[in-house]
Design a protein with these regions (language model features):
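A generic "binding-loop/recognition-motif" signal
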Residues: 2, 52, 172
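Generic hydrophobic-segment detector
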Residues: 8, 12-14, 50, 71, ...
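Nucleotide donor/acceptor-binding cores
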Residues: 11, 43-45, 138
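S-adenosylmethionine
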Residues: 34, 73-181
Length: 182
């Protein structure tokens, strides 16, 4: 555990990642958190696909999201996410944490913001499902993309009706903000 003195303009997330992914220190997580900070989450409906430690759900809630969903296929990650939500004073009644594949657990729901920090090969597969949960003005924030896989992710995203608005980089890792094509 690290002690940290919060600055006046900061939101601080407390985490015990256990064996779940997402401590905030990995470049993919920090890149996605930076992208999240640049968006307006006020009263938005968001989903964190592959929630892991729950760090992105927590960030979304702290940034003002109205409805926050998180999905994961791993039972252990679900437990870690629950613990971390509670550690950050977020009641499990305030969020929806769902175990299972995306379209199996999300029925007829559309989201303003989709966040996902998973390896590129998984992102490419998920895009076929993500397209069904987007609104006309949704924002999609992806991370977990190694440099040489970025073109593949972008190509797939474009094939399902998204366009790249921004790419951030840290060492060999890439993160991107995607918008629904008008």
């Amino acid at each position: 555990w690290r002690e940290y003195e919060k600055q006046a303009d900061e939101l601080v997330i407390e985490l015990d990642p256990g064996r779940a992914f997402g401590t905030g220190s990995h470049p993919t997580t920090s890149l996605l958190l930076k992208l999240m900070e640049e968006q307006d989450f006020t009263n938005k409906t968001i989903i964190d696909i592959g929630t892991g430690s729950g760090i992105l759900m927590i960030a979304g809630k702290l940034l003002g999201a109205g409805e926050v969903y998180g999905t994961d296929i791993d039972e252990f990650s679900m437990e870690v996410a629950k613990e971390n939500l509670l550690l950050n004073n977020i009641s499990l009644d305030e969020v929806k944490l769902l175990k299972g594949n995306l379209l199996e657990v999300i029925e007829n729901k559309k989201f303003d913001i989709v966040v996902c920090n998973i390896l590129a090969d998984v992102l490419v597969k998920l895009l076929d499902e993500i397209k069904y949960i987007l609104k006309e003005d949704s924002i999609v924030l992806f991370s977990g993309i190694i440099e040489d896989k970025l073109a593949e992710v972008i190509s797939k995203a474009e094939s399902v009706g998204l366009e790249v608005a921004e790419v951030k980089e840290d060492k060999e890792w890439r993160s991107c903000r995607l918008l629904v094509k008008k």
